[in-house]
Amino acid sequence: TEEYWGNVNPVGPRGVYDEAKRFMESITMAYNRFHGVQTRIVRIFNTYGPRMRLNDGRALPAFIGQALRGEDLTVFGDGSQTRSFCFVDDLVEGIYRLLMSDYDMPVNVGNPSEITLKEFAEEVIKLTGTAQKIVYKPLPVDDPKQRQPDITKAKQILGWEPKVSRAEGLKITYDYFKNLPKEEWSKLPKEFVSMK
């Protein structure tokens, strides 16, 4: 929930990422309180869709890139860690509704449909119609075991919840990547950075 303030290792390898998000929420609320500036805080969870950056180390472009190049898909750990993927159109609608509201506390905007990274890689293999295997590599330190938003406030305050199914969103995203010139496929990451 939005009331959860985190349980992170501030000196771990992903500490800067986690702490930077918490700092931005703190500074945003400080401006809101002390300067009377209207602010909104949206907590965005894993987002995907056409035109996402090809080489930012996220799971989906890495998996699709590996599949398009005929490579095995890389999963860190045993693949049991979970993520929740929100299609970009749904995210934009959620952000817009928050901006148009008068609510100034944090709101989670993401898709609560949770999937393991192993299952997600299997979905990509099935979607692409390829015969790749999944290759497992050691899990990085402090990699989140679960990432699933509670969107109760988004539903109650904004009347928002995601509409695009993961299957539909994956198909749209895959078609976008597949139709890029083949030289662009080389820009897709060789594997994802597990900490994102």
Language-model features: where?
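Short secondary-structure boundary/capping segments
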Residues: 7-8, 64-65, 99
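Conserved active-site helix of classical SDR/Rossmann-fold NAD(P)-dependent CH-OH oxidoreductases
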Residues: 22-29, 64, 92-93, 118
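C-terminal substrate-binding subdomain of Rossmann-fold SDR/epimerase-dehydratase oxidoreductases
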Residues: 1, 46, 67-196
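Catalytic helix-loop patch of NAD(P)-dependent Rossmann-fold dehydrogenases
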Residues: 1-41, 55-56
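Short beta-loop-alpha junction of Rossmann-like oxidoreductase domains
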Residues: 50-51
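A glycine/serine/threonine-rich, flexible loop-to-helix segment
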Residues: 54-62
